[in-house]
């Protein structure tokens, strides 16, 4: 899993908004297309070689690169079809932005809470999180390895909803938007909440994402505390590849 961008809310210098490239030896999926992530994507895979795009929700920092990608696919690369999985609200927002249908090239499939899709050899399961708009956390599994992604959420959701058999996760990328003193003020997580949530989900590795600029060190220390994750915590740094 390669981090294309992990900035919360707005792009930071050198760090686009949310975007991840999830790959197996035979499959490549772009997970969330936040502002600025198309350029980094092309450093790792050609747009024509993508098997699908998965979008967690309609907030701009997670999806608004797609109108640019639509134009590039139609008018530059001449790509006829790219499968896209996302919420109905995301599709409607993007249709309004482009002023018309998304297809071609985006062959859109609406997904919602409880949906499952298979892309190549990677399975994707979706669970609606605690966020003001329909937002889907993601469980991606291939070859016996499991990756979890919180997208945006508050505390009234848990990774166990993606893992009913309690098998755990090899890697979780979890948002940690809020400073500790703002706990509960928005439907986002503090680093302590993220750490505790991922410990309860039996995550073997945790990487924090969706943070504001310059707070990463403090957030990691909060998440590593005994009452949180209780072990080493990483950050989703742009350009870094996690092997799951």
Task: List the model feature ranges, each with a label.
Residues 19-22, 136-140, 242:
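Short beta-strand scaffold segments in enzyme catalytic cores
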């Amino acid at each position: 899993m390669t981090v294309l961008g992990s900035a919360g809310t707005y792009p930071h210098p050198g760090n686009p908004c949310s975007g991840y490239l999830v790959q197996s030896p035979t499959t490549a999926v772009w997970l969330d297309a936040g502002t600025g992530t198309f350029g980094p994507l092309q450093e790792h895979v050609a747009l024509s070689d993508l098997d699908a795009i998965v979008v967690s929700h309609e907030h701009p920092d997670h999806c608004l690169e797609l109108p640019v990608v639509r134009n590039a696919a139609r008018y530059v690369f001449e790509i006829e079809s790219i499968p896209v999985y996302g919420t109905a609200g995301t599709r409607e927002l993007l249709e309004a932005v482009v002023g018309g249908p998304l297809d071609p090239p985006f062959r859109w499939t609406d997904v919602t809470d409880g949906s499952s899709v298979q892309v190549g050899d990677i399975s994707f399961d979706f669970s609606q999180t605690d966020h003001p708009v329909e937002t889907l956390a993601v469980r991606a599994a291939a070859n016996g390895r499991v990756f979890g992604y919180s997208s945006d959420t508050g505390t009234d959701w848990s990774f166990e909803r993606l893992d009913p058999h309690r098998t755990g996760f090899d890697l979780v990328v979890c948002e940690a938007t809020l400073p500790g003193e703002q706990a509960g003020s928005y439907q986002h997580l503090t680093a302590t909440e993220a750490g505790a949530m991922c410990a309860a989900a039996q995550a073997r590795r945790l990487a924090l994402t969706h943070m504001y600029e310059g707070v990463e060190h403090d957030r990691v220390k909060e998440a590593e505390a005994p009452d949180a994750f209780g072990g080493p915590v990483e950050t989703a740094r742009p350009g870094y590849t996690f092997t799951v």
